[in-house]
From Swiss-Prot:
Domain notes: The DBINO region is involved in binding to DNA.
Residues in Helicase C-terminal domain copies: 1381-1535
Entry EC number(s): 3.6.4.-
Protein's name according to its UniProt entry: Chromatin-remodeling ATPase INO80
Taxonomic path: Eukaryota, Fungi, Dikarya, Ascomycota, Saccharomycotina
Molecular function in Gene Ontology: ATP binding; ATP hydrolysis activity; ATP-dependent chromatin remodeler activity; DNA binding; histone binding
Its job: ATPase component of the INO80 complex which remodels chromatin by shifting nucleosomes and is involved in DNA repair.
Annotated gene: INO80
Subunit field text: Component of the INO80 chromatin-remodeling complex.
Span(s) of short sequence motif DEAQ box: 935-938
SUPFAM superfamilies from the UniProt entry: P-loop containing nucleoside triphosphate hydrolases
Stretches assigned to coiled coil: none
């Protein structure tokens, strides 16, 4: 049912008031009580009317629920009104911080729009409550009419009721005065009381103000107040006029009643009576109030007593139980309906009571102010709503106005039955009760307090029975108990008169009996006056010291009252401790903080005022102090400044004195160092001059002799002979250079030089004595040798040139003197031959056959072996290289016992590399070598290397260093070579650096002035130990080499890459450039790597990233299969494996009916009529004319017409086709008009030969004959068509869409025949060469009988034949500036028949260059570091012997040492080396002995890059070499060519020089 639904929806917060309840109290522990109500309807209504009424009631309930929800939302929106002012204030405060910014005000406007929309929504919601308000107004109008009628009756009976009421009240006052006092004090402690009387509920409109003021009766009228609140909230807006009008009517009645009340109120003598009298005038109906007050005061005592008995689980006892049963039986007789109530009571716990009291206290505190403000309006509203028929469901019974009046008059009030509101009541009454229920449920406070579940379990319209299950919570159970007690108390009041009549008799009997009375009374009651006057205050003496409050009570009652008041007292204390104490503590704390804040404010104000007073009074004192401090500060600054100036002057004077002293000391030190260096130089010069005079180096150098230098040298060395000078060594550290004169220093220097010479001779003599084995005749003593001119040894199988023979004499003299030397002839002058001639000279003249040690780079090992074998065949050579096992076997040939080698020794000369020297140092150091030759001695230029240290530790009689560049980078390398040959003279690198290095290197770098005297002294020191000759001085037939620097500009791609690298480098670019010019091994590795990246950009941008092959996406499916071979089937037909993923399925019905000819269509008839019946070739006359011209028969013409196009093309290519016949006809007509047989046959034979040639040209598609027969076509295709590149590159490519007809074999057979017809496939494809050979040679098939092939046309352009595009080589060439210049240069060099050496630093660049040369079809070979020794020998041999090789690609480090490449006349450096001497050695591979043509050297450089910086640094290093070795102070002249046409001119000029 919908009623059950309504009750179930509100079971959490609705209360159901049940009429006429029969209560059965049982002491159980259950938490709820089940009430089953059976309602019987009357016989006047039918079931149909009930259903209609219930349906209508349900609709009203639904509407009320909706309105309730709207009202709740309205309350939420109403809260915005309270905060509107606060929001406006907050916005005003925020607007101050917005600083008049447009964005901030835009944000404010958006907020205002938002809140405006919310306010409009609130107004719409507020207007939606009109329907509910109209319904409530109707109810109020009906109730007002009834109230007016009842009020008119009450006005007429006011006087009589007041008189009777005052009398009854005075009678009851003597017994209830003490009770009122105690209950009023108890009510103040508690939040709300737990009992209510039926009369108070009946007249709630007249006593509402007293209920609000008195806290003890607040909970009693809570249900009524909830109804008042709900109605007020509904009527506040729309019914103000009606309410005010009604309130005026009520106010007039209340005024009259107040007047009557003031007249009838008694005088109050005691304090309790005054309190009661002060509350009486506030009521609206004094007669009812007086009656209710008397009943309330008399009932409170019983209620409190009953509460205490409930706590002890003893609800009622003895007599009370019997009286309650009588009341219940009387009520059952008066009820019209049968209501069955089954209830259970719970045991109450003290904790639950306290919690409920706490909740009630909190709610009362919150409601206090609101109830006082709206008290008068609520009274008027309640009087308008309620009428005489209203009653509380929990009230056991109500009395009408007449009954109350009769009771006030003193008549006994008998309970009159009142019909409760049930389902069968009037509609208006039911609606009014339900509205009350709903309004009660709206109030959150009532929901919180009265949470009772009620569920309609069953409704039977036939039996007129409605069963409702009501579950009462603890609060309602307690309330029910109080209602029961109220019913009991009403019965007691009726019997009160009987008890009062017996009171006098009881007092008299007590006086007569005395102490023997069994009944113990505490105090005797006072007799009341008959006219209701003042009470007698005569009391019996209190014997138990318990408070009796002026009443007669037993000991048990006194204890119960005391216990009740104690509990109330402790409850109040607990509430105070729990609530008020915390509030007071917070309040005290807040007061203290406010007080402290005020103190601080006062103190700050006082301090500010005090400071103002001080400023006014002590301003002059403050100014005086300020001036005094300023004066003191200025005085201190003055004296500090004065002291600082004096201190600075003193320091300056001391500094000047120290500088002067330091300068004088430096001058003395410079003089001393100059004398020291002069002493050391003089010592070295004397030794060098003496050795030079012995070996005559000046005569050997030829044109390089300096006359002025020789004169100075002779003047310096006059009167000094080392042979006659005593050999006394004087340590220069012990010499006092400050006091010694020049002559004494020169004498000591001569003694030291003589000592060095003597030690050198002794060392040589000792080595010779060890190797002579004690022979008598010794020819190796150099002192016994005179100045003999040495001739060419006879065992030397070559003829030495004049300068080479002089070099042999110089080397022989060095050997005789026991001095080591450096043969530093320019590359290409035959240093190898001169060194081999010295070994031959020792073997031939002195019979010294070894052991000789030759150490050379790995690239020249085979060259040395070949040279020695060629020039001195008698020498036995031991090639010491290979793996460890090979070297172990070679070491067996060493003869360590015989230190003197002869011609029959196992070997004479051992040739090894520098790597082997380092790895096998322990074995090589054990040998004593007669002569050690180091080829390319710049390999030991570093004194810190392991090569230098290991070779210096070898036991050798003489050491010879062969190098064309003794100085590569700096003077330190020269000192390393000099110390290697003469450790005793050149022992300190620091001294050598002080002598020469600083001056010469600074001159080369900064072009400073060079000390010529110091340079001459250096040359004088070096001359005895180093022989240096250049080609132009000693070799007149060898022409000069031309060096050309070709400057190029970066291409666009290179420039972008270069800028990107510069931007990504964290280090400054200038620092990187300096690192590029500095070849010091200690440089930062990161810098070197950065330089290499820039050099890559200069060489070619593809060194970073190669161009990718471009190909479209293939939208195809590729075939996948396993092995295709089958048993007994050597040939397998393979269809096209690549197909399109898209397949079009043609419906078979369409193919059969519309495409294939059949009996249902006319396709066959149309084909016959078009191709046969109406064909022009079907005419007989036309066919005759055609056959006359072509020579074909009528049937052949028809076959040609009806044949396929491809078959006709194949037929035309046959030897005796129509074309051949036409050629025959044309030849006959050209030669002779007569058709004689002789002419015809001769011409026919000629035509047949041409047909054979034509067939041969077609068969040999790639042969020489094809090229000869198609010269024009070949040239046109190669020059024009193949030069065109594809400009469009598709993104996707795919195979054609395949068509399939499922279930039709005819289509698949026809498709396969067209795609794979053997005749067409053979005609389109070319016959393989192997098949042609078998047909022509083995099977003897004539060429003109070969089947037609190669009809598929070849593409006009190779780049258009496929969508796969390879990177363009033209773009590859033009993207590199160097490669573009090289491409132009090679064209000119190829025309001039030059042969070119191209040197590279990077092997990856060599790979790119090979691709370029292959594209240009230049023949070339390559040699780099990865080439093996055997391959290197073969490559050099091929280059020297094969003139068809145009270009030789070499790595500068691998191919620039010790090899002879004189077949080339042009050298191109694609990129330069860090060390200029490496490049010099590389170019001298071609510019050397045996070169008959002019040698031109091209060096490709990029302007404005790191390469230009490296080139400048290389020129500085070359200048140092020229200064030291040749004495030149001017740099070498190198021609520079800018980017343009000068390269071709230079190449042409070099070609002209070569031809001349």
């Amino acid at each position: 049912m919908s009623l059950a639904k309504l009750l179930n929806n509100d079971d959490d917060d609705n209360n159901i008031n049940l009429p006429n309840i029969n209560v059965n109290n049982t002491n159980t522990n259950d938490t709820s009580s089940s009430i089953v109500t059976n309602t019987h309807t009357t016989n006047t209504t039918t079931n149909l009317q009930k259903e209609k009424f219930l349906n209508k009631l349900n609709n009203d309930f639904n509407l009320l629920n909706k309105r309730d929800n709207l009202e709740l939302n309205y309350q939420d929106w109403k809260f915005l009104n309270y905060q509107e002012f606060e929001l406006l204030n907050e916005w005003n405060q925020q607007s101050k911080e917005w600083n008049n910014s447009i964005k901030n005000f835009e944000y404010l406007y958006s907020l205002m729009k938002k809140y405006k929309s919310e306010w409009e929504n609130y107004l719409t919601l507020k207007s939606s409550d009109k329907y509910l308000k109209n319904v409530v107004n109707d109810c109020l109008i009906n109730s007002n009419t009834n109230n007016l009628k009842s009020k008119s009756k009450l006005k007429t009976d006011t006087k009589t009721k007041a008189k009777s009421k005052s009398k009854s009240k005075l009678k009851l006052k003597s017994n209830s005065d003490a009770k009122v006092k105690s209950k009023s004090s108890n009510a103040k402690a508690k939040a709300k009381t737990k009992s209510v009387s039926t009369q108070q509920k009946r007249k709630r409109t007249t006593s509402i103000k007293n209920l609000l003021e008195k806290e003890d009766s607040a909970l009693t009228s809570l249900d009524d107040m909830d109804e008042i609140d709900d109605v007020n909230e509904i009527l506040n807006n729309d019914n103000n006029d009606e309410i005010t009008q009604n309130s005026k009517d009520l106010s007039t009645t209340t005024a009259t009643e107040k007047k009557l009340n003031t007249k009838t109120s008694p005088s109050k003598k005691r304090k309790d009576e005054v309190r009661v009298a002060m509350k009486k005038p506030m009521t609206s109906t004094p007669n009812v109030k007086t009656e209710n007050k008397s009943k309330q005061k008399s009932n409170k005592k019983n209620i409190d007593a009953d509460d205490n008995t409930y706590d002890d689980n003893n609800l009622i006892n003895g007599k009370d139980t019997e009286e309650l049963d009588d009341i219940e039986k009387a009520k059952d007789l008066e009820d019209n309906t049968d209501i069955e109530i089954e209830g259970t009571n719970e045991n109450e716990d003290e904790d639950e009571d306290e919690d409920e009291d706490e909740d009630e206290d909190e709610e009362d505190e919150e409601e206090g102010e609101e109830e006082e403000e709206e008290e008068e309006d609520e009274e008027g509203v309640i009087n308008m709503i309620e009428n005489e028929d209203d009653e509380d469901y929990f009230a056991p019974g109500k009395k009408s106005g007449r009954q109350n009046a009769s009771k006030v008059a003193g008549e006994p009030a008998a309970p009159v039955p009142k019909t409760p509101t049930t389902i069968h009541s009037d509609r208006e009454r039911i609606v009014r009760e339900l509205i009350k229920m709903c309004n009660k449920n709206k109030n959150k406070k009532s929901r919180k307090r009265r949470f009772t579940n009620s569920i309609v379990t069953d409704y039977n319209p036939e039996e007129n029975k409605l069963i409702v299950k009501v579950t009462l919570k603890q609060y309602h159970v307690r309330k029910l108990k109080k209602l029961i007690n109220d019913a009991k108390k009403l019965r007691e009041e009726e019997e009160m008169k009987l008890k009062k009549s017996l009171m006098k008799e009881a007092e008299n009997a007590e006086e007569l009996e005395g102490p023997s009375s069994k009944k113990k009374k505490l105090n005797s009651g006072t007799a009341q006056n008959e006219n209701g006057g003042e009470q007698n205050s005569e009391f019996i003496q209190n014997t138990h010291d318990l408070p009796t409050y002026g009443m007669q009570m037993t000991l048990k009652e006194a204890k119960a009252i005391k216990r009740h008041y104690d509990n109330t007292f402790f409850t109040i204390l607990k509430d105070l401790a729990r609530k008020d104490s915390a509030k007071m503590a917070r309040l005290v704390q807040q007061i203290q903080s406010i007080r402290a804040t005020n103190f601080k404010k006062n103190s700050s104000v006082c301090a500010r005022e005090a400071r103002k007073w001080q400023q006014r009074n002590f301003k002059q004192v403050k100014d005086f102090q300020t001036r005094a401090r300023r004066g003191i500060r200025e005085m201190l600054n003055y004296w500090k400044k004065n002291e600082r100036e004096e201190r600075d002057l003193k320091k300056k004077a001391e500094k000047v004195a120290m500088e002067q002293a330091r300068k004088e000391e430096e001058d003395r030190e410079n003089v001393r160092q100059a004398k020291k260096l002069n002493f050391l130089l003089t010592q070295t010069e004397l030794y060098s001059h003496f050795i030079g005079s012995k070996i005559k180096t000046n005569e050997l150098e030829g044109n390089m002799k300096d006359d002025e230098f020789d004169e100075n040298e002779d003047n310096l060395m006059n009167n000094i002979d080392l042979d006659s000078t005593s050999s006394v060594k004087t340590d220069f550290k012990t010499i006092d250079f400050d006091n010694e004169d020049d002559d004494e220093l020169r004498r000591k220097a001569a003694q030291n030089a003589s000592n060095v010479l003597q030690k050198s001779r002794e060392k040589t003599k000792k080595f010779d004595n060890d190797t002579s084995n004690g022979e008598e005749l010794n020819f190796q003593n150099p002192t016994s040798l005179g100045e003999v001119v040495i001739e060419q040894p006879s065992i030397l199988a070559c003829t030495l040139k004049e300068y080479q023979l002089k070099g042999l004499n110089w080397l022989a003299n060095l050997y005789d003197q026991g001095i080591n030397g450096i043969l530093a002839d320019e590359m290409g002058l035959g240093k190898t031959v001169q060194s081999i001639s010295v070994l031959a000279h020792l073997a031939e003249k002195y019979n010294i056959w070894g052991p000789f040690l030759v150490v050379t780079p790995a690239s020249t090992l085979h060259n040395w072996v070949n040279e020695i074998s060629k020039f001195v065949p008698q020498f036995k050579i031991l090639p010491y290289w290979g793996n460890s096992n090979d070297r172990k076997i070679l070491r067996r040939f060493w003869d360590r016992k015989n230190l003197r080698y002869n011609k029959d020794s196992p070997f004479h000369v051992m040739i090894t590399s520098y790597q082997m020297v380092v790895s096998d140092t322990s074995y090589l150091q054990k040998m004593k070598w007669q002569y050690m030759i180091l080829d390319e001695a710049q390999a030991i230029k570093s004194s810190q290397s392991s090569r230098w240290r290991n070779l210096l530790s070898f036991h050798c009689r003489n050491r010879l260093l062969l190098t064309g560049t003794p100085i590569q980078n700096n003077m330190q390398e020269l000192w390393a070579l000099l110390h290697f040959i003469m450790p005793s003279l050149f022992d300190s690198h620091d001294e050598f650096n002080d002598w020469f290095s600083k001056d010469i290197e600074s001159h080369a770098e900064a072009n400073t002035k060079l000390n010529q005297q110091q340079l001459r002294r250096l040359h004088m020191i070096l001359k005895p130990f180093m022989l240096r000759r250049v080609k132009k001085n000693v070799q007149s037939e060898l022409g000069d080499k031309i060096e050309i620097d070709v400057m190029c500009d970066l291409t666009q791609r290179q420039a972008k890459l270069y800028q990107i690298l510069k931007s990504q480098m964290s280090t400054n670019y200038d620092v990187i450039e300096n690192a590029a010019g500095d070849d010091d091994t200690g440089s930062d590795q990161n810098m070197i790597n950065a330089v290499m990246q820039f050099r890559k950009v200069c060489n070619h941008p593809d060194l970073f990233e190669r161009a990718d092959v471009d190909s479209p996406f293939s939208f195809s499916i590729f075939g996948k299969s396993s092995s295709l071979s089958r048993d007994n089937e050597p040939l397998v037909d393979i269809l096209y494996s690549t197909r399109n993923p898209i397949t079009y399925h043609l419906p078979r019905l369409i193919y059969n009916d519309l495409i294939l000819p059949n009996y249902e269509n006319d396709l066959g008839l149309k084909n016959k009529l078009l191709n046969y019946t109406f064909s022009i070739f079907n005419n007989e006359s036309t066919c005759k004319e055609i056959s006359r011209v072509t020579g074909l028969t009528y049937g052949e013409i028809k076959r040609v017409v009806h044949r396929d196009l491809l078959m006709n093309a194949i037929h035309l290519k046959e030897p005796y086709s129509r074309q051949t016949f036409l050629e025959k006809i044309s030849v006959i007509e050209d030669n002779d008009k007569t058709f004689s047989d002789m002419n015809f046959k001769s011409n026919l034979k000629l035509i047949e030969r041409s047909a054979k040639l034509d067939a041969l040209s077609r068969v040999t598609s790639t042969g020489v004959l094809n090229s000869l027969l198609n010269i024009k076509e070949q040239v046109f295709d190669n020059e024009y068509y193949n030069a065109i590149s594809r400009s469009y590159h598709p993104n996707v490519s795919s195979s054609p869409v395949s068509i399939q007809v499922l279930g039709n074999r005819h289509f698949s057979i026809q498709q396969e025949e067209e795609l794979f017809k053997p005749v067409i496939s053979k005609a389109l494809s070319e016959i393989p060469a192997s098949t042609q050979y078998n047909m022509a040679v083995e099977k003897k098939i004539p060429l003109h009988d070969f089947p037609v092939s190669g009809l598929y046309p070849s593409p006009l352009n190779k780049s258009f034949s496929s969508y796969i595009s390879m990177p363009s080589m033209d773009r590859f060439i033009t993207e590199s500036a160097k490669l573009k210049k090289l491409d132009e240069l090679l064209v000119e060099l190829k025309k001039g028949d030059h042969r070119v050496l191209i040197y590279f630093q990077m092997t990856k660049m060599m790979d790119l260059m090979e691709e370029y040369l292959t594209y240009r079809q230049y023949s070339h070979i390559r040699l780099d570091g990865s080439s093996k020794l055997e391959d290197r020998r073969d490559l050099v041999h091929d280059w020297q012997t094969r003139p068809d090789i145009f270009i030789f690609l070499l790595s500068t480090r691998a191919g620039g040492l010790g090899i002879n490449l004189t077949a080339a006349d042009t050298v191109i450096f694609y990129d330069s080396d860090w060390n200029p001497t490496i490049d010099s050695q590389a170019m001298d591979r071609a510019h050397r002995l045996g070169q008959t043509r002019q040698v031109t050297v091209y060096r490709l450089l990029i302007r404005g890059t790191i390469e230009e910086r490296m080139r400048d640094r290389a020129k500085q290093k070359e200048h140092v070499q020229q200064v030291v070795m040749e004495g030149k102070t001017l740099q070498k002249d190198v021609k520079t060519i800018e980017s343009g046409g000068d390269v071709k001119a230079a190449a042409a000029a070099s070609t002209a020089l070569t031809t001349n």
